[in-house]
From Swiss-Prot:
Major location (coarse): plastid
Membership in a protein family: Belongs to the complex I subunit 2 family.
Name of the protein this chain belongs to: NAD(P)H-quinone oxidoreductase subunit 2 A, chloroplastic
Source organism superkingdom: Eukaryota
GO BP term, example: ATP synthesis coupled electron transport
Topology in the lipid bilayer: Multi-pass membrane protein
GO molecular function: NADH dehydrogenase (ubiquinone) activity; quinone binding
Pfam families: Ndh2_N, Proton_antipo_M
InterPro entries in the record: NADH-Q_OxRdtase_suN/2 (IPR010096), ND/Mrp_TM (IPR001750), Ndh2_N (IPR045693)
One cellular component (GO) term of this entry: chloroplast thylakoid membrane
Alphabetically ordered keywords of this record: Chloroplast, Membrane, NAD, NADP, Plastid, Plastoquinone, Quinone, Thylakoid, Translocase, Transmembrane, Transmembrane helix, Transport
Organism field: Nicotiana tabacum (Common tobacco)
Transmembrane as UniProt keyword: yes
Length: 510
């Protein structure tokens, strides 16, 4: 009899849980429609992989790309809708979050064509690669809209775990295994530090997990100026610093960039930063609203260290991917200026604008590196000498992307940095902007050094890799070259027509 009653209670509880989940999905599911498209794409990929043979491989790429494009379209149709909080306060939909989701989807859409030829040449498992990319994208999108500490952590780990698996995808490569181990250990440590900071917020706010409720809880408990908030701020800043590759938490970045497959590095170099920036803007702006002076100071120190160390160490590198790793550390130092300025002086708008330009510049550079690596098998900067004599199109494309990264006019990188530094100057961050200008000059030096190598025609400087360089048939590399052309064009002309981009970014601010 007792067993019968317990069984009935279990059935009733299960039914209630199911009905509540069904109610949430029915009424709140439309608010995560772009994410649902990606989930449907993931299911389709699994079904095709289980029921098809090698002849259906193009369908896998088609489904992945189509689901990403459809998700972008769904986001665009939802633009300028009223902000909504759904799933019992766990997820927030507004224009500011959707801008970051759009950037993550754009990165993934451009990265898949970069991977096609590389995967075929290295004989990597295609389905699993695409699954990890889409799942990481999904985690990044949920991270952009997460509105409570638990959802933030789950979405962050969804993205991070896929990143670890992607970095070690070429498991027969010793460097890839080493990169994965370092990435996993450092990433796990940073997540632990971040969660420890979250636990302080949870305790000080009286047991609240929603971001806005944490602020209310801190006011009610009179803990918003307590030493505990400073402890939480330090731990959360360190955790986010690892995710953003800010100095001095950047140690994992060069090894992961060098050891991971190049398309994976291209993907991680932009999506991880966009997702972490989406998290940083909300974490610092909402729960730490009363500690703005403290986190401004912390971020200023990290930005200065990143700009100086990243650009100075990049000069000494001999590997193209390691050079871009240190360059990315310097670049994120510039972006931090936008976070410090905030939405009062267009800081967030300048950050979003520069990240859009950075995506095109960085992915264009990596597209060139993928092509060169497939045709020569090397990543050494010295081996790029004389490339212009063999492949002028690739050499010019790489030169334009590097010049844009350096911030030379009239390319997009120049206008992006100009807007970012101008916002910083207007906000009174004079020292930070001066450091940014000086380190930008340093970065131009090592970018020009590579471009000089590309354009050299002296035989004694040309290595056997370029001397024996052979262009592959266009048909085999058209997807990589398509991504490269799109990124090069964007890196060249986006800055000239940046006013509409700035207007959209300003319109998204909460």
């Amino acid at each position: 009899m007792i067993w019968h009653v317990q069984n009935e209670n279990f059935i009733l509880d299960s039914t209630r849980i199911f009905m509540k989940a069904f109610h949430l999905l029915l009424f709140d599911g439309s608010l995560i429609f772009p994410e649902c498209i990606l989930i449907f794409g993931l299911i389709l990929l699994l079904m095709i992989d289980l029921t098809s043979d090698q002849k259906d491989i193009p369908w896998l790429y088609f489904i992945s790309s189509t689901s990403l494009v459809m998700s972008i379209t769904a986001l665009l149709f939802r633009w300028r809708e009223e902000p909504m909080i759904s799933f019992s306060g766990n997820f927030q939909t507004n224009n500011f979050n959707e801008i970051f989701q759009f950037l993550i989807l754009l990165c993934s859409t451009l990265c898949i064509p970069l991977s096609v030829e590389y995967i075929e040449c290295t004989e990597m498992a295609i389905t699993e690669f695409l699954l990890f990319v889409l799942t990481a994208t999904l985690g990044g999108m949920f991270l952009c809209g997460a509105n409570d500490l638990i959802t933030i952590f789950v979405a962050l780990e969804c993205f991070s775990l896929c990143s670890y698996l992607l970095s070690g995808y070429t498991k027969k490569d010793v460097r890839s295994n080493e990169a994965t181990m370092k990435y996993l250990l450092m990433g796990g440590a940073s997540s632990s530090i971040l969660v420890y900071g979250f636990s302080w917020l949870y305790g000080l706010s009286g047991g609240e997990i929603e971001l806005q409720e944490i602020v209310n809880g801190l006011i009610n408990t009179q803990m918003y100026n307590s030493p505990g908030i400073s402890i939480a701020l330090i731990f959360i800043t360190v955790g986010i610093g690892f995710k953003l590759s800010l100095a001095p938490f950047h140690q994992w970045t060069p090894d992961v960039y060098e050891g991971s497959p190049t398309p994976v590095v291209a993907f991680l170099s932009v999506t991880s930063k966009v997702a972490a920036l989406a998290l940083a803007t909300r974490i610092f702006d909402i729960p730490f609203y009363f500690s703005s002076n403290e986190w401004h100071l912390l971020l200023e120190i990290l930005a200065i260290l990143s700009m100086i160390l990243g650009n100075l160490i990049a000069i000494t590198q001999t590997s193209m991917k390691r050079m871009l790793a240190y360059s990315s550390i310097g670049q994120i130092g510039y972006v931090i200026i936008g976070i410090i300025v905030g939405d009062s002086n267009d800081g967030y708008a300048s950050m979003i604008t520069y990240m859009l330009f950075y995506i095109s510049m960085n992915l264009g550079t990596f597209a060139c590196i993928v092509l060169f690596g497939l045709r020569t098998g090397t990543d050494n900067i010295r081996d790029y000498a004389g490339l212009y004599t063999k492949d002028p199109f690739l050499a010019l494309s790489l030169a334009l992307c590097l010049l844009s990264l350096g911030g030379l006019p009239p390319l997009a990188g120049f206008f992006g940095k100009l807007y970012l530094f101008w916002c910083g100057w207007q906000a009174g961050l004079y020292f930070l902007v001066l450091i940014g200008l000086l380190t930008s000059v340093v970065s131009i030096y090592y970018y020009l050094k590579i471009i000089k190598l590309l354009m050299t025609g002296r035989n004694q400087e040309i290595t056997p890799h370029v001397r024996n360089y052979r262009r592959s048939p266009l048909r085999s590399n058209n997807s990589i070259e398509l991504s490269m052309i799109v990124c090069v064009i964007a890196s060249t002309i986006l800055g000239i027509s940046m006013n509409p981009i700035i207007a959209i970014a300003q319109d998204s601010l909460f």
